[in-house]
Amino acid sequence: NTILIVVVGTLSSTIMTAIGAYVMSRKPFPFQKAMMLMMIFTMYFSGGMIPDYILRNNWLHLGNNRLVLILPALVSTYNLIVMRTGFAAIPDSLEESARIDGASEFTILMRIIIPVALPCMAVIILFYAVSYWNSWFEASIYLTDRKKYPLQVILREILIVNSTTEMQVGESGNAQAIGESIKYATIMVATVPILLIYPFLQKYFVKGIMVGAVKG
């Protein structure tokens, strides 16, 4: 479940973020600033837990569906702004030469913008992967079928059961040792997969952060 959510969510979010960032980074269009302000507004203010639950469960009918963990978080405003800044740093002359050769907007995005901004894309992919991998709160609320639980929810349940067992057994040395071992094991299980991915993206990470943070 976790691998499926991370892979599908990361790919979908990266594609949608790249499309949105490309549109927002090109020549100004009507209501562009208003749209950007609306996106930034969502970074600081949310509708709250109850309206969010009603939206996902009653209106979108995503209750007990893995898509409930992907669709509402499909595009991160912060990642969109970072990628938009990275795309905006690419010279317009590259696009103009491609348009002269008859390239469409989609071709320009896939053949020119994304390859040039690959370091920035790698950073965004890592951000989304870590976000989906660590997500557990939404799953604990919207998923009722244990077969659909991601790894983080299972690890959380293990820690809760372990804490309850420690309280029942008492503060004996063996109980504490077992409890600490379980905690360290869950930390390793939750952390190692991301640590294995990072070395492959490390060469892009610093460069991508700089491209996305500084224009020009």
What annotation goes with each model-predicted range?
Residues 1-216:
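A hydrophobic, multi-pass inner-membrane permease signature
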